[in-house]
From Swiss-Prot:
One record GO biological process: proteolysis
Enzyme class of the recorded protein, top EC level: hydrolase
Name under which the protein is recorded: Carboxypeptidase Y homolog A
Propeptide: 18-122
Organism per entry: Coccidioides posadasii (strain C735) (Valley fever fungus)
Entry GO MF terms: serine-type carboxypeptidase activity
Glycosites: N207, N506
Name of the coding gene: cpyA
Amino acid sequence: MKALTATLLVGTALAAVPPQQPIQVPTEDSAWAKPLENLKDTFKTLGNDAKQAWNELASAFPDAINEYTLFSAPKKHTRRPDTHWDHIVRGSDVQSIWVEGADGQKRREVDGKLEKYDLRVKAVDPSKLGIDKVKQYSGYLDDKENDKHLFYWFFESRNDPKNDPVVLWLNGGPGCSSLTGLFLELGPASIDKNLKVVHNPYSWNSNASVIFLDQPVNVGFSYSGGSVSDTIAAGKDVYALLTLFFKQFPQYATQDFHIAGESYAGHYIPVFASEILSHKNRNINLQSVLIGNGLTDPLTQYPHYRPMACGEGGYPAVLDESTCRSMDNSLPRCLSMIESCYSSESAWLCVPASIYCNNAMIGPYQRTGQNPYDVRAKCEDGGSLCYSQLGYITEWLNQKSVMDALGVEVSSYDSCNMDINRNFLFHGDWMKPFHRVVPGLIDQIRVLIYAGDADFICNWLGNQAWTDALEWSGREKFAKAELKDLTIVDNENKGKNIGKVKSYGNFTFMRLFGGGHMVPLDQPEASLEFFNRWLGGEW
């Protein structure tokens, strides 16, 4: 569950959160310090909508505005000695390698500022955890200058690891662990209510090696004394991790590489892929990206919350007519605020847009008690983002035996860190126009946008709309392309219709029938079907 509903609901939660749950806004040593008092000149330049949103926030939560910091508290951790690890890859060593180019000139073997990074690697004994029989590695990427430590867990392909592609999986939030994707969606196993490991025959490592990464820092098993609060900053760390990982394991570097994720990964993935492609000399063979039920172009996607909640997305209405009309009435102001955010990309305009729009367009649905990740179901466990299985996963991962087997250095695991969620929101990251990066990707690699059609929070209507509207060289032909049936082709259910797909050039949109926010959870067979065919280059 790459980008959990809690991610998108931050604005709603902030607008409706009870006073005992303070909003964390930065104060000391921050440009945000007492924003409505100390930045009066900036405030005067805001539009009326943005001013009103800030005033409403300050009135509702005066103590929060003035007293709380934006940074998440560091996780308790104990660093393991270097002797614990099988390998430590020094970024400074990799950075110092020079080679002779085709033109006879000396150049660095790989680009990028890697001196401050190290990668620690430990082989995971498959027999200790019983997740899968394949070769596994876990460890940390260390940013020594900024005290950041990102946790990863690698699973080799069950099929042909010497030739199968490598995939990086990212959950969203922002602030949610990618181990959710591992155990709830597409990894080699799940965890049942008795904390037993259950084999997943539809795991995405059936025909690909998969890296699950907890990012940004202070998410899952990752930790830091500092913080990352925007998508751009997170991209540098991901590039460093992949570069050092493939340096340690060159046998995987020759394979095709893909980045996949969901929800807020609709922000992450375009930026991370762009960061990789910006380096001419690299050891990352990036071929495509896959974004599932993502948030990428809010201006185009937010108008589709009302239709999805009101019976126009292929499922019965969740909201009554009066509430639907109220959402329609709120939409113009919402879109005006997002347009201002797009024009300036200033937190002072993007934050009010997030707060107002999430309250107006997502809040009414959230208050029904229906699962925002699946319009067909009630939210069964609000504390675990509507899925009780997340509680089992969290309990299993918090076992000392599990942490020791993985070389974990933090004292506890949480599936989501809502401090990180708020940090990204209050830096204006939520509403920024990351779709503008996508045309540059399409020029170089394949891009898949897929969407389970029962999701509300990042629904298929909005994802189809932004892909049709995207400004790129093939826009007109893509928008006119026919949505064709997507059917199973390679097992006993051959011919079963699992969705719709359209494609032109390097750009593909896919609607998956019966899938919620987490397609691999709801439709595991269909998920593995399209995934394998995408990696095979069918679209």
